[in-house]
Amino acid sequence: MQTLNVGAGRTDEEYKEAEDQRRADLLANSRSDANYFFVAAGLAALGTGLLPVRLNILVSIGVLDLLGLYGRSLNPVYPLAMYGAAAAWVIMLLALGFAGRNGHRWAFLAGMLLYGADMIALIAMFSLWVFGVHAFFVFKWFQGQKALKDLQDPGASTF
């Protein structure tokens, strides 16, 4: 029986099985965290008026709030611009969700950057509850990108 120094008495076979299990767990965790892109897209559609019911007290997009506040002096194109920007936001979140589920770490980083920038706009609009919802998504996407980073690093420890 051959043992490895890193496995605390485990054989090569046991070590490989444990490593395969760790990799499977990390992949499952990253896919689970990528599903939050779809939740965010649904909440964004709910908060921006793309759905028949609008609930912008609990969920909102800071950039669209600023556009609504300062963009009212536009011409009759204003409602179309608001719906177009909201639809682009939702489509972007859906695309990031599919990319994240396929194991692309950049999707998580882009989502964190997108929502981090939007959190600045939310602070300007004094939407603290929505800021907390955004922070939750940023945290979940950070966990997803970290799982993919650990998955790509063969010597990473799970401790």
Whereabouts are the PLM-identified features?
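Topology signature of small-to-medium multi-pass alpha-helical membrane proteins
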Residues: 2-159
